[in-house]
From Swiss-Prot:
Gene3D superfamilies: Ribosomal protein L30, ferredoxin-like fold domain
Subunit structure: Part of the 50S ribosomal subunit.
Pfam families for this protein: Ribosomal_L30
UniProt keyword list: Ribonucleoprotein, Ribosomal protein
Entry's Gene Ontology molecular function annotations: structural constituent of ribosome
Name of protein: Large ribosomal subunit protein uL30
GO biological process: translation
Amino acid sequence: MNGKRIQATGATLRVKQVRSVVGQKQNMRDTLRSLGLKRPGQVVERKADAATVGMINTVTHLVEVEEA
C-alpha cells in the first residue's frame, strides 16, 4: 500500500516508519508521533478509522502500510 491512498475500513493496519523525519516539516513530525512512531523501522498496529487513515495519507512517503 506504499504510495497509495487508503480508505477507512475498520480493519487493522500495520504501519512501519521507513524514512527519517530529519528535513521534514513539523506537521509531518507531529503526524508520525500521533501515530506512535518515533524512529525508522518501528512498527505499530492501528485500526483503520477515518482519523488514522487521514494521518497515514499525510505521511505516505515516510511509511509503509499493510493489512494485519
